[in-house]
Every structure is written in structure tokens, then in C-alpha cells.
Amino acid sequence: LIGHHETDGWVSDYENQIEAAFNLYKDHGVQIVKTGYVGKLLDGKERHSSQFGVRHYRKVIELAADKHIMIDNHEPVMPTGLQRTFPNLMTQEGVRGQEWDAWDKDGGNPPVHTTIIPFTRGLAGPMDFTPGTFRFENPVLPQTRVQTTLAKQLALSVVLYSPLQMASDEIENYERNPEPFSFITTCPTTWEQTIVPEAKIGEYVTIARKERGNSGRWFIGSITNEQPREMQLPLSFLDKGKRYLSLIHISEPTRH
């Protein structure tokens, strides 16, 4: 169970209520809060990246830490590594995430987008891109289609690092696709080792991550832009002399 605090940018009103809200969550065992600040200005006058905004974001994270609550911050300031001081800051948006696919008239993010952000926004820390879209047609905008595939949505859980993953689709769409959804529910979010066997910014990327602990399991995500291609995956990072069983999710050849 995750609490959602959408402030609409009115942070002074939020600060007047936040401690009571966090106390309520603590009493009921709610351990995660997703905050939001939709709007160009905070309190109608301050930029998100202003001193006013930075102090507010830190205040929320500090208070949440005191209540043992984790934060997923949307519409944040530029990531600065604050999660090193406050590890309850699990992840942040700060990226043109998958929500754009829901309302953009051109179908949202183009396939090339996710081959770029691991090397730009991804360098600044965990990002909540909200992968996991299983239905690609939009009845609200019937002329559009989300520019992705089911296999790519699963791969993004590995390619885009976030210790807290938020799946983006409706429950009914997951119930209709139980096998791929099981990948989302079992894919780790913290890793012991990460390597990049093959990548070219804006074209393709393959990322392999080893699950933390003693399982020895590796998870590999591989994505491309609009162009189909065959990619090489050297497996030299696997333990020599050990046998592995692979479960592979793959897109149709005509999709990306």
C-alpha cells in the first residue's frame, strides 16, 4: 500500500498537513509515499529548483525518514545524491517518463528515448520511469499507440535502475497477461553487480545485473531504437563451470 500526495505545487498547504499525514500512515503501516508537484511554480511563485523548493523537498524527506517512510518524489529538483544521506529517498522522477504515453497525441515517447536516458538522467541516480505498460492502444486518443512492445516493457525494469519500481498499467491488463506480469513481480530492484555488455547511446543498450544475495541469478535487459537489429551478448560474466537456466521474453521481429 502506497500513499499518494499530489500537492499540485501548493507546498505551504502541504507542509501544514504533512506531519499529521505521515503519523496516520505510520499508525496504519503505510511505508511508502509518492509525492507530486504538478505545475510550473510552487505556491504560484517559486521555481521547483529555487532555494525555497530545495528546502521544501529536503524537509519532506527528513520528516519521512523520522517516521520511517520511504519517498518516491515526482516533479523533483535535479538529483544531487541526497539518497546517500537519506536512504529513504528511494527514487525520483525527473525524466520524461512513461506517463507521457497516456496523453501525448503522437503516441508519447519514441523508442529512441529509452536508449538515451540510461546515459543521461540515469547517471544522476535512481529514476522512476514507471515501466510496465501492457496495453498499447489508448481509447481516449484512438489515433495513437504507445511506441513500445511487451518485451521492451519488461526489459526496462532492468535497464532503468530504480530501487522502487512503479508499474504503470491497470490491474485488468496485468490479469490478462499473468506470465509477463510475473516477471515484474519477481524482478529484483537492488543489485550486487551491473555490467553493460553492449551499448551505443541513442541506438541500443544491453544491461546485465546480478541479483543481490546468494541466488546467483542474472537479469538482462536489451532494448533498441526504431531500427531492428541483431545484438551480441557475450556471457563471460557468468560463473565458469556453472549451468544456468534461461527464461527469455522477446518481441516480434517487426516491433521494437
Describe each PLM feature range.
Residues H68-E75, W100-A102, Q165-Y174, Q193-I195, ...:
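Acidic/polar loop patches that form or flank catalytic/metal-binding clefts of enzymes
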Residues I201-K240:
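Carbohydrate-binding surface patches
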